From Swiss-Prot:
Keyword field contains Magnesium: no
UniProt entry keywords in alphabetical sequence: DNA-binding, Late protein, Virion
Protein's recorded name: Structural DNA-binding protein p10
Gene Ontology CC terms, in alphabetical order: virion component
Biased composition (Low complexity): 1-25
Length: 78
């Protein structure tokens, strides 16, 4: 298989340039896979809404609670 080093390197350069360019220009459209939040049953937004309705504080010492922390608190309050 006679492959020239020159053509190979230029091809590689082209692909990397193209993908990085289109990715930065388009933002999130380049992502084909769903974000991790889409796979889980409950979204973070849902958790926050449940916590609010139950009167559970979402913020703890100045920072927002993580999804798992909110989940624990919601389960405890049931």
């Amino acid at each position: 298989m006679p492959t020239k080093a020159g053509t190979k390197s230029t091809a590689n350069k082209k692909t990397t340039k193209g993908s990085s360019k289109s990715g930065s220009a388009r933002g999130h459209t380049g992502k084909t896979h769903a974000p991790p939040s889409m796979h889980s049953g409950m979204l973070y937004k849902d958790m926050v809404n449940i916590a609010r309705s139950k009167g559970i504080p979402i913020y703890q010492n100045g920072t927002r609670l993580t999804k798992s922390e909110l989940e624990k608190k919601i389960k405890r309050s049931k």
